[in-house]
């Protein structure tokens, strides 16, 4: 239906665009109730798109409940994110409720069960790329409960958005610097990669980017072995020591996961002719001190605080909150990776 000659947007224009009657539009705009949330959202979005000149109500009258599900928050990265979610819950705007669910386990079945537990309007989750998780996301999508993935994506699922960083670029960056900084033994050198396992898309993408960049640079470094330590510091230390004994030509270690303490302990065992370079992830209290005193060469931080904030903005925009200005469809995350070395550390270490 065309607009009136004056160009004024009428309730009938909004009704036509939203696919409802003008009486329904009137009930929504004047907040008279008796309209479902989905129809209310459709009407508000149509009015916004058409530029209806009046103060519009919120797309949702009831409180929108968001569940952030985080596993094994004893790890520094997840601890930082859990802390930020706690901060967000204290200062979120009216009409939002943030629940923080902390899990002791991160196996796919436990995570998937947690996702389906309770009644929420949105779920934000850090989860492995596994069939159980895909099924849980798809089930929530059918319930009109959008899912935002954090830190590690679950590609090919029905999730609404990914709020993390580009892990391929992170892996490429690690390889770029390591290939140019590492010493060579007779012109050659080996590098070892440590990760949780490739079940987490973040680690798989980092390793892929790292390997591709090493091959593209062709500067005499060879990826000798990938060690899977489950992000457990002690297990990672033990496995790394075994690996270093097999590869005395190792000149660099790239930790694509979170067990930085295990790497430092393995290097401290002095199993190599010379100390290897160590590139890892996340700026924590521990890595801050390791970077400052030279035990760690570089750290690539993925800004978990910004990821939590972006995930919240995605949900807010999806439900029609006016305050969501960063997150717009198709919801491409702009969270950056930040490279830290000894010369650009914050003056004070993180908590």
Task: Label each region the model flagged.
Residues 1-58:
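N-terminal helix-turn-helix DNA-binding module of bacterial transcription factors
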Residues 46, 198, 214, 303-351:
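Hinge/cleft segment of the Venus flytrap/periplasmic-binding protein
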Residues 54-110:
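Amphipathic helical "hinge" segments at domain boundaries
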Residues 76-91, 170-174, 201-220, 262-263, ...:
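Short, solvent-exposed amphipathic alpha-helices that sit
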Residues 85, 89-112, 190-192, 214-233, ...:
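Short beta-strand elements in bilobed, periplasmic/extracellular small-molecule ligand-binding domains
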Residues 122-141, 210, 227-286:
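Hydrophobic alpha-helical
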Residues 132-169, 284-292, 296:
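Flexible loop/hinge segments that line or gate small-molecule binding clefts
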Residues 163-189, 236-237, 283, 287, ...:
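Hydrophobic alpha-helical segments within soluble ligand-binding/sensing domains
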């Amino acid at each position: 239906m065309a607009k009136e000659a004056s160009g004024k947007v009428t309730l009938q224009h909004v009704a036509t665009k939203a696919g409802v009657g003008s009486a329904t539009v009137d009930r929504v705009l004047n907040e008279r109730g008796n309209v479902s949330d989905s129809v209310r959202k459709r009407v508000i979005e149509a009015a916004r798109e058409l530029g209806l000149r009046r103060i519009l109500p919120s797309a949702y009258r009831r409180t929108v409940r968001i569940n952030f599900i985080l596993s094994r928050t004893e790890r520094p990265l997840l601890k930082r994110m859990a802390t930020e979610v706690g901060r967000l819950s204290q200062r979120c705007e009216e009409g939002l409720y943030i629940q923080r669910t902390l899990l002791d386990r991160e196996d796919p079945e436990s995570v998937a069960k947690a996702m389906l537990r309770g009644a929420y309007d949105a779920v934000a989750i850090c989860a492995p790329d596994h069939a159980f998780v895909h099924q849980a996301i798809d089930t929530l999508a059918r319930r009109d409960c959008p899912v935002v993935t954090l830190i590690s994506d679950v590609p090919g699922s029905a999730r609404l958005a990914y709020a993390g960083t580009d892990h391929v670029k992170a892996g490429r960056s690690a390889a770029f610097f390591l290939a140019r900084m590492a010493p060579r033994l007779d012109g050659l050198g080996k590098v070892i990669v440590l990760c949780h396992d490739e079940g987490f898309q973040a680690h798989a993408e980092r390793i892929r980017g790292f390997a591709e960049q090493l091959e593209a640079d062709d500067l005499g470094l060879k990826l000798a072995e990938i060690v899977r330590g489950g992000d457990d510091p002690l297990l990672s230390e033990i496995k790394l020591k075994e690996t270093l004994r097999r590869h005395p030509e190792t000149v660099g270690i790239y930790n694509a996961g979170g067990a930085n303490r295990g790497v430092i302990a393995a290097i401290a065992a002095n199993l190599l002719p010379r100390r290897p370079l160590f590139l890892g992830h996340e700026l924590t209290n521990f890595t801050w001190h390791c970077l400052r005193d030279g035990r760690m060469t570089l750290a690539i931080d993925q800004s978990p605080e910004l990821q939590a904030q972006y995930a919240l903005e995605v949900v807010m925009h999806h439900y029609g909150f006016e305050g969501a200005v960063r997150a717009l469809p198709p919801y491409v995350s702009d969270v950056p990776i930040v490279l830290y070395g000894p010369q650009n550390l914050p003056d004070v270490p993180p908590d």
